Amino acid sequence: MSERQRGTTRPRVPETSAGGFVLCSDGSLRVALIGRLNRGGRIDWCVPKGHPEGDENLEQAAIREIAEETGLEAEIIVNLGDIHYEFSAGNKLISKTVHHFLMRQTGGHLTVENDPQREAVDVQWFEIENLDNTLAHENERRMGRGVQEWLARQ
């Protein structure tokens, strides 16, 4: 029986994040992914992302989050689009939109030491062709395929 059928509903809370795939500056077709511990204690490889702060626009938030979670400085190449999903958090239903960008590394080095929330436990470079086998979430795997398609057209 659904919540609606039972006469109960949880408040739906909209949430926005921005992040993306950062191409390595060495010219290889590798992107930086962060590792987060899942509930089972295993590492899930994910696209770095987070919430805009203050007056930040989506692009600024994505660049800042990349720096915090990966240690990399980056510039945006192209907007890859958005993904939408919902999940439960306590008594709320979070309705999340994540804005993804393809970026190019302009400086920095891989480290999770700058992540203020300490969500990332690892960061590594991964070959773009292996993203389908690496990324933990299907919606991010779809975005990874979009990166491959975009690069193939260039």
PLM features per residue range, with description:
Residues 146-154:
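C-terminal alpha-helix
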Residues 42-46, 121-124, 145:
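A short, polar/proline- and glycine-enriched secondary-structure boundary/capping micro-motif
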Residues 52-142:
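Unchanged
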Residues 25, 106, 149:
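Residue-level marker of positions within ordered structural domains that often coincide
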Residues 2-47:
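N-terminal strand-loop-strand
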Residues 21-22, 64, 146:
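Charged/polar positions on well-ordered alpha helices
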